[in-house]
Amino acid sequence: MVIDRAGYRLNVGIILVNDSDRVFWGRRSGHDAWQFPQGGLAPGETAMQAMYRELHEEVGLDKGDVEILGSTRRWLKYRLPKQYLRHGSEPLVIGQKQKWYLLKLVTSEQKVRLDLSDSPEFDSWRWVDFHEPEQQVIFFKRQVYIQALKELEPLLKKERRTPYGLKRKRGNQRA
């Protein structure tokens, strides 16, 4: 776990989209809470390395299963409410500082596996409309989700264009 001087845990978030621009939305194991895949950086690990590790651990996908469409320009952060702070742990983590990645699924969704870890993060998942997570995520993560989705959404439109500015057809076909 990597924590900055201010007490924020360095973390990556993953927005995985399909050909219909719907996003992967996972239900946390044992909770009625939904979120994007995310996870902390290990010491010496880059954000991109952490992103691929978390993608595999939480969703069962590897580098060849996705295309990186982009990432947030800066780290986005949120503070944990007092009731979520773990006062008995050292160092005290007051929130998360996250680098967000927008990934396009380029393989079959049948490759998604939630059971590759001894303690899976998710027990269920579904595709939802691009902005639906903004309303469903737990309240203290909401602003970061809004910021990440707003910043990364234009990359979907850019990805659909050819060098001549024509829209790409849905699916694997190119216009």
Swiss-Prot record:
**Short motif Nudix box, span:** 39-60
Instruction: Check the record and name the CDD domains matching this protein.
Output: NUDIX_Ap4A_hydrolase_plant_like
The record's SUPFAM superfamilies line, in alphabetical order, gives: Nudix
Per the record's keyword annotation, is Cell membrane included, yes or no? Answer: no
Q: Which UniProt keywords apply?
A: Hydrolase
The record places domain Nudix hydrolase at 7-150
UniProt keyword Nucleotidyltransferase, yes or no: no
Q: Which residues form a coiled coil?
A: none
Cofactors required = a divalent metal cation
Family annotation (InterPro entries) = Nudix_hydrolase (IPR020476), NUDIX_hydrolase-like_dom_sf (IPR015797), NUDIX_hydrolase_CS (IPR020084), NUDIX_hydrolase_dom (IPR000086), RppH (IPR022927)
Q: Which Gene3D superfamilies match?
A: Nucleoside Triphosphate Pyrophosphohydrolase (3.90.79.10)
GO terms (molecular function) for this protein are: pyrophosphatase activity
Q: Which Pfam families match?
A: NUDIX
Q: What is its EC number?
A: 3.6.1.-
Read off the NCBIfam families from this record: PRK00714.1-4, PRK00714.1-5
Record function comment: Accelerates the degradation of transcripts by removing pyrophosphate from the 5'-end of triphosphorylated RNA, leading to a more labile monophosphorylated state that can stimulate subsequent ribonuclease cleavage.
| Entry similarity comment | Belongs to the Nudix hydrolase family. RppH subfamily.
Task: Output this protein's name.
Answer: RNA pyrophosphohydrolase
The scientific name of the source species is: Legionella pneumophila subsp. pneumophila (strain Philadelphia 1 / ATCC 33152 / DSM 7513)
